[in-house]
Amino acid sequence: MNQTEAAPVVSVSRVYAHVNEEMPREYWDYENMQEVFGYQDNYEIIRKVGRGKYSEVFEGLNVLNNSKCIIKVLKPVKYKKIKREIKILQNLAGGPNIISLLDIVRDPESKTPSLIFEFVDNIDFRTLYPTLSDYDIRYYSYELLKALDFCHSRGIMHRDVKPHNVMIDHKKRKLRLIDWGLAEFYHAGMEYNVRVASRYFKGPELLVDFREYDYSLDIWSFGVMFAALIFKKDTFFRGRDNYDQLVKIAKVLGTDELFAYVQKYQIVLDRQYDNILGQYPKRDWYSFVNRDNRSLANDEAIDLLNRLLRYDHQERLTCQEAMAHPYFQVLK
């Protein structure tokens, strides 16, 4: 090999890299899974509570025991995708702060499947987040990291971490990570679809079309949520489209640092970036601190954030490393 040709950088997760290899095939081979359906008549729809690209979500009632539940009616998508979501939910059953799948039913005529979940009395994040204290932010961030560490330890990337998918019952101080429709099994060295996560929460790896990503994608999304919480912003990086999203990130993390990342993994940037990227120095996190957020954006919070929001996915803290950070010491 000639000197100028560097060997391609192999990117493998620093943790839980081989979980699925060590599991029996049926653990991750969702395509060959046989679902068992319950009875649709056991559930009644009360009211609509949300809708997504792939589903409509209702508050429901289990008529057998008169308990509330959530009914997620799936829109027609590839059945393989539905199987993946079910398999992942079953694999994660009972994990800390993971939403519980109670039943799977389907309409006898239309064959439309619905997933029945535990009920969480959620307060919309736009209402809740501005009211959270410093302690609350530490507490709920830690609870979310528990859920993420658990799914990662089971060989699963969530790939859609954002406030809309974190249900919080503030009265009970209960957090649940929901919507596992984009979640996927991690196999080291495998190339994945970069069309995952919501724009404002997409990691740089997705925006530069790097397909060999891993669990650290979820850490980026978590970091973006955390930044918005401590700096009291609605959204921390708010791009107009996927290209502009990377520009918004570069204006904070710097362009030299972006080029170093791209070079390390031998990524070829889309030519569209030539005209829009410009040149930006890395911004100091303290430049986002103001009178309004000073009590939340303290030294420990900023040190943690700095270790989460890194271009290089291999440099980001893992969930366990983040949970061991001094920021969370007060909870222990």
Swiss-Prot record:
Reactions catalysed according to its record: L-seryl-[protein] + ATP = O-phospho-L-seryl-[protein] + ADP + H(+); L-threonyl-[protein] + ATP = O-phospho-L-threonyl-[protein] + ADP + H(+)
Keywords: ATP-binding, Kinase, Nucleotide-binding, Serine/threonine-protein kinase, Transferase
Active-site positions on this chain: 160 (proton acceptor)
Cellular component terms per the entry's GO annotation: cell tip; chromatin; cytosol; division septum; mitotic spindle pole body; nucleolus; nucleus; protein kinase CK2 complex
Gene Ontology molecular functions: ATP binding; protein serine kinase activity; protein serine/threonine kinase activity
Record domain Protein kinase: where: 43-327
UniProt binding sites for ATP: 49-57, 72
Domain of life: Eukaryota
Gene Ontology BP annotations: DNA damage response; establishment or maintenance of cell polarity; negative regulation of transcription by RNA polymerase II; positive regulation of establishment or maintenance of bipolar cell polarity regulating cell shape; regulation of cell cycle; regulation of establishment or maintenance of bipolar cell polarity; regulation of mRNA splicing, via spliceosome; signaling
Pfam families documented for this protein: Pkinase (PF00069)
Entry's EC annotation: 2.7.11.1
Xref: InterPro entries: CK2_alpha (IPR045216), Kinase-like_dom_sf (IPR011009), Prot_kinase_dom (IPR000719), Protein_kinase_ATP_BS (IPR017441), Ser/Thr_kinase_AS (IPR008271)
Keyword Flavoprotein attributed: no
Assembly, per entry: Tetramer composed of two alpha chains, one beta chain and one beta' chain.
Protein family per UniProt: Belongs to the protein kinase superfamily. Ser/Thr protein kinase family. CK2 subfamily.
Chain's role: Catalytic subunit of a constitutively active serine/threonine-protein kinase complex that phosphorylates a large number of substrates containing acidic residues C-terminal to the phosphorylated serine or threonine.
Name assigned to this protein: Casein kinase II subunit alpha
Protein source organism: Schizosaccharomyces pombe (strain 972 / ATCC 24843)
Lineage: Eukaryota, Fungi, Dikarya, Ascomycota, Taphrinomycotina
